């Protein structure tokens, strides 16, 4: 079988490595514009239980190969904070890895297995020819996939552009922080959200997110991420943290969530963010990419008929991702209104509000009933 993959992100690379491991006679070619995936937005991933299981099925020694020169902290707890409250909760065990580390490991693994990586940017008009030249074409080219756009009607694509802006940073201080951190700090402009994962004991990959209105107000108005750092450091250090953000030289991005009604058209299939992309609060992360890649590879290993394999892949993934997609959309809509949610809630309840999101109305009702003696 001859397979071409457009894009060398986690989904396409994992698929190529896994399938080539079990079908070394398959001819797999990845088309990737030089450094495009490596330089794409985002600076890291958190690998949790399912991710490590899937990596181990491809490479029993993946951890040693991934971290050959250093040790990364194991994450077992999540720290939630607002301006004046905090709570530590259990976290599904995992560890963080930089984007560069993960992609370099997967690229090296792919080439060692005989996968061809070609330095070429595929244009939309070239996709039909690829479909003629190969038995199967995978669009693994990320959230702005050219195949997704070219076949949007056939694939029944949908996207939701949230009224939220985010960007990536690193935080490096003397303070040790090995938890996954989720902060929501209220300010004059609105609520600033911080999500971070430890790369070392003293360094974290950080996402800062806020509503469009928040970014367009007060001290943040008109400021690029680098210019906003002094204000963000001051605000986010008010509850016991040492925040000293380092810019990733990336702009503010508008968050976009992708979904599809169908994952393939003829002999072309979508994989990874090209098909589904979720807000981080849905708890999916790189798991979606690995799960889709593994599922498609399994379908091809069990079905010599490509059409049947793609039909099974489509059914399995849409079944698997229906609920995460609903959760992601629900949370995105909640975050779009987070400034208002905090404004109408007493500060003593901000942490519970943040933790329970759209269920908080029931939380308040329950507490009110208990306070009046109705609750038993």
Residue ranges and their predicted role:
Residues 34-54:
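Conserved N-terminal glycine-rich FAD pyrophosphate-binding loop of Rossmann-like flavoproteins
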Residues 20-41:
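Glycine-rich FAD pyrophosphate-binding loop
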Residues 20, 48-170, 375:
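Conserved N-terminal helical subregion
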Residues 11, 36, 144:
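Conserved Rossmann-like nucleotide-cofactor binding loop
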Residues 298-376:
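C-terminal helical "tail/cap" subdomain of flavin- and related membrane-associated enzymes
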Residues 133-241, 247-250:
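Conserved FAD-binding catalytic core of PHBH/FMO-like flavoproteins
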Residues 10-17, 138-139, 251-330, 334:
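Conserved mid-domain beta->alpha element of the FAD-binding
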Residues 1-11:
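Beta1/beta-strand and adjacent pyrophosphate-binding region of the FAD-binding site
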């Amino acid at each position: 079988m001859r397979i071409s993959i457009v894009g060398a992100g986690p989904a396409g690379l994992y698929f190529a490595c896994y399938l080539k491991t079990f079908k070394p006679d398959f001819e797999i070619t990845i088309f990737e514009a030089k450094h495009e995936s490596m330089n794409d937005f985002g600076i890291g991933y958190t690998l949790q239980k399912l991710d490590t299981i899937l990596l181990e099925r491809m490479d029993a020694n993946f951890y040693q190969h991934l971290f050959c020169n250093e040790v990364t902290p194991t994450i077992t707890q999540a720290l939630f904070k607002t301006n004046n409250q905090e709570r530590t909760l259990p976290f599904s065990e995992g560890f963080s890895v930089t984007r560069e580390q993960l992609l370099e490991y997967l690229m090296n693994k792919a080439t060692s297995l005989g996968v061809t990586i070609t330095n070429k940017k595929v244009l939309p008009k070239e996709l039909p020819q690829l479909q003629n030249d190969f038995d199967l074409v995978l669009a693994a080219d990320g959230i702005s996939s050219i195949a997704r756009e070219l076949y949007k009607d056939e694939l029944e694509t949908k996207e939701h552009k949230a009224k939220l802006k985010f960007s990536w940073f690193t935080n490096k201080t003397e303070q040790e922080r090995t938890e996954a951190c989720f902060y929501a700090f209220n300010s004059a402009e609105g609520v600033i959200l911080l999500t971070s994962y430890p790369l070392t004991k003293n360094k974290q990959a950080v996402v800062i997110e806020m509503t469009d209105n928040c970014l367009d107000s007060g001290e943040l108005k008109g400021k690029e991420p680098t210019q906003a750092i002094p204000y963000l450091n001051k605000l986010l250090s008010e509850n016991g943290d040492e925040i000293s953000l380092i810019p990733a030289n990336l702009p503010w991005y508008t968050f976009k969530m992708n979904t599809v009604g169908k994952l393939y058209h003829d002999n072309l299939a979508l994989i990874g963010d090209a098909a589904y992309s979720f807000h981080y609060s849905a708890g999916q992360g790189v798991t979606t990419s690995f799960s889709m890649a593994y599922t498609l590879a399994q379908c091809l290993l069990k079905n010599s008929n490509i059409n049947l394999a793609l039909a099974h892949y489509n059914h399995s993934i849409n079944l698997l991702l229906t609920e995460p997609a609903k959760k992601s959309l629900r949370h995105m809509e909640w975050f779009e209104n987070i400034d208002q949610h905090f404004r109408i809630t007493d500060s003593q309840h901000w942490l519970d509000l943040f933790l329970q999101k759209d269920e908080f109305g029931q939380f308040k009702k329950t507490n009110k009933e208990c306070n009046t003696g109705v609750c038993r």
